[in-house]
Amino acid sequence: MAKSTFMYWQKRFNRENPDKDMEEKILELRSVHKDYGYRRIHAELCNQGHSINKKKVQRIIQKLKIQVTSFTRKSRKYNSYQGTIGVIAPNRIKRRFHTSIPHQKITTDTTEFKYYEVDERGNRTLHKLYLDSFMDMFNNEILSYNITKHPSVKNILDVLDRTIKITSDCIYRRTFHSDQGWAYQLKEYSSRLKDGQIFQSMSRKGTCLDNSIMENFFSLLKQEVYYGRIFYSYEELKTEIERFIKYYNEDRIKEKLGWMSPVQYRMNYSISSDII
């Protein structure tokens, strides 16, 4: 081997990794945001004041072997439809899942999770947990939710009342969207909306795409905290769901929100409105 070639490679091996600090920063971000791909990590770095090319972030992620690998499985979707037992509202939203006005368009749905309880003899019994949540289409923020062991009218009306109160500052007439689940058809539910001068909107029967914005949130939630794991208590599963919702609202950035989290986007909108 020529001496010049030997010296070249020796210098390369002895040279300190110029990307060491950035690699450590990216590893730190991935430890907090486990579902972030290179685009979100690049946006987060830019939000923190770092100047780096998106392709370089992608190369570092590939080098560190920390590409996102989401665990998914097919599971039967929770179906609360029990036929026509009340009034079916028209589909006012019609898949227009966006508004520039906070608290104007709200959507809701219920999903279920499974967990086990083990008795003294080691026998496992399967149980279910239900999440009722309301989302603001303005910034995809989860405004309120209930986590319960059984679906009930009281639970859904409780979280509905909280959402109506939270969104009462909207100066325009509000629209609350849902599927045709049994609870949303009840007179008690529709009466509360009518009393608040709120339009009621419903998806068409068996058309989950009419509420895909909420379906996407449930899918993300389950990929992050549920699929691939087994829970052995109600409290353990409930705590994980609450942790994710807080993280989703306050920290998880979205491209459609200008790489801000739902709460950051809302606060930024509020500041801009005050200035105007």
Predicted feature residues:
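Mobile-element integrase/transposase regions
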Residues: S51-K63, Q67-S133, L157-V159, I166, ...
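Generic alpha-helical secondary structure signal
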Residues: M1-T5, N155, V159, E188, ...
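C-terminal domain-tail junction helix/linker
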Residues: K194, L220-I276
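RNase H-like two-metal-ion nuclease catalytic core shared by retroviral integrases
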Residues: S80, T84, S178-Q180, L186-K187, ...
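Mobile genetic element proteins and their domesticated derivatives, centered on retroelements
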Residues: F6, I26, I41, V57, ...
